From Swiss-Prot:
Pfam families: Vma12. Its main location: membrane. Accessory component of the multisubunit proton-transporting vacuolar (V)-ATPase protein pump. GO terms for biological process: cellular response to increased oxygen levels; intracellular iron ion homeostasis; lysosomal lumen acidification; lysosomal protein catabolic process; vacuolar proton-transporting V-type ATPase complex assembly. InterPro entries: ATPase_Vma12. This is Vacuolar ATPase assembly protein VMA12. It is a multi-pass membrane protein. One of its GO terms (cellular component) is endoplasmic reticulum-Golgi intermediate compartment membrane. It comes from Homo sapiens (Human). It is found in: Cytoplasmic vesicle, COPI-coated vesicle membrane; Endoplasmic reticulum-Golgi intermediate compartment membrane; Endoplasmic reticulum membrane. The keyword Disulfide bond does not apply. One of its GO terms (molecular function) is oxysterol binding. The modification N-acetylalanine is found at residue 2.
Length: 208
């Protein structure tokens, strides 16, 4: 917090011999304090500006009060031309090494927990995707097997019908009898194939 001014050349000259404050008959204590403050040089934060003269706000208030009591024509703002508020450099306290180490440990723990959480979500998603693809593969294979079974069933029934129709020409001379015999044989073969196909499908469903 600011508590002093960087005195400008105007204030320094006013307090010197023959200066503007000489006719104002400053109290001895106030003059001594002002001269001591202006005579003491402080090193500022900026080395290029050189030594700096610091005057506390209390001395400035006392000077202002004295000028008002004397009804002086010399105003304080005129004396403070070129002066600036002095803001001391804030010195940061050293950090506690134990506290710093503890904070770093907490950061590492939080980072590890976050990494585990992210990787756990990714693993779960991969597992779900893998299970879905596996189920889809099983369904495709089952559908393929079903299509092949139906195709084999149709081919077998048609083959039984054709073979019976062609072979029955040596037994029956009429076409109607030959067709009827072929239908009977094809039906029997179809029922047998259908029975085998149903049992096979039941076995596959039991495995699923």
């Amino acid at each position: 917090m600011a508590s002093s001014l960087l005195a400008g050349e105007r204030l320094v000259r006013a307090l010197g011999p023959g200066g503007e404050l000489e006719p104002e008959r400053l109290p001895r204590k106030l003059r001594a304090e002002l001269e001591a403050a202006l005579g003491k040089k402080h090193k500022g934060g900026d080395s290029s500006s050189g030594p700096q003269r610091l005057v506390s706000f209390r001395l400035i208030r006392d000077l202002h009060q004295h000028l008002r009591e004397r009804d002086s024509k010399l105003y304080l703002h005129e004396l403070l031309e070129g002066s600036e508020i002095y803001l001391p450099e804030v010195v940061k306290p050293p950090r506690n090494p134990e506290l710093v180490a503890r904070l770093e440990k907490i950061k590492i723990q939080l980072a590890n927990e976050e990494y585990k959480r992210i990787t756990r979500n990714v693993t779960c998603q991969d597992t779900r995707h893998g299970g879905t693809l596996s189920d889809l593969g099983k369904q495709v294979r089952s559908l393929k097997a079903l299509v092949i079974t139906i195709f084999n069933f149709i081919v077998t029934v048609v083959a039984a019908f054709v073979c019976t129709y062609l072979g029955s020409q040596y037994i029956f001379t009429e076409m109607a009898s030959r067709v009827l015999a072929a239908l009977i044989v094809a039906s029997v073969v179809g029922l047998a194939e259908l029975y085998v196909m149903v049992r096979a499908m039941e076995g596959e469903l039991g495995e699923l």
